[in-house]
């Protein structure tokens, strides 16, 4: 039956094997992936390709950082991770409801622009996404040429059966992080949360207020209505 699972966001510097990790996840889930980003944002009404894959993969997408767009992505993440029945619609086909098995992953760089692709982590979303910090490390085998990359990938694939056996038959979720709904408690890396907070609309508004109130020629403390603060911050010369 249906069992929900959190989305996985891999966030880190360039060349930190984020896309490689997603490729391994695809193989672990059966070897098929779909690209849900555009449909989640409402740029297309068709999503039948999602139902041909187990891994919903978001990577190397043109970043969209508008708050409305980020909230749409958040709705899509909640839908893909927590809902059993899913609406499937193909081109020139009637929509039907199906019950797929999906796991969603995202990879993005940790610069300010790409971090703002992530949706705001409100109470309804925070437990449905993992935020993991990725760092660059030397590969265990040479990967400087296409031929070397293929040898490395083939070696990884040879290890997958043993890795799957370890996950299914030898390893179990520690009690300290076990959680009933998703099986494991969500985790948000503190550095990612801090960086997201620094770029949030609320923090940017606070920065604007600080720039206005604490500038060198600003008057002393004063009481103002919210509408007056907005007018003051949006003056052409402020």
Regions found by a protein language model. Name each.
Residues 18-19, 66, 113-117:
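SF2 helicase motor core recognition
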Residues 97-103, 111, 117-198, 214:
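Phosphate-sensing "switch" segment of ASCE/P-loop ATPases
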Residues 1-58, 130-133, 167-168, 229-230:
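P-loop NTPase catalytic core of nucleic-acid-dependent motor ATPases
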Residues 21-25, 72-80, 101, 124-128, ...:
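Alpha-helical scaffold elements adjacent to nucleotide-binding pockets in ATP/GTP-utilizing enzyme cores
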Residues 11-15, 75, 174-238:
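DNA transaction DNA-binding modules
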Residues 12, 40-47, 89-95, 115-120:
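Catalytic micro-motifs at enzyme active sites that drive phosphoryl/nucleotidyl and oxygen chemistry
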Residues 46-97:
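Conserved nucleotide-sensing/catalytic segment adjacent to the nucleotide-binding pocket
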Residues 12-14, 29, 60-62, 81, ...:
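Short, flexible loop/turn elements at secondary-structure junctions
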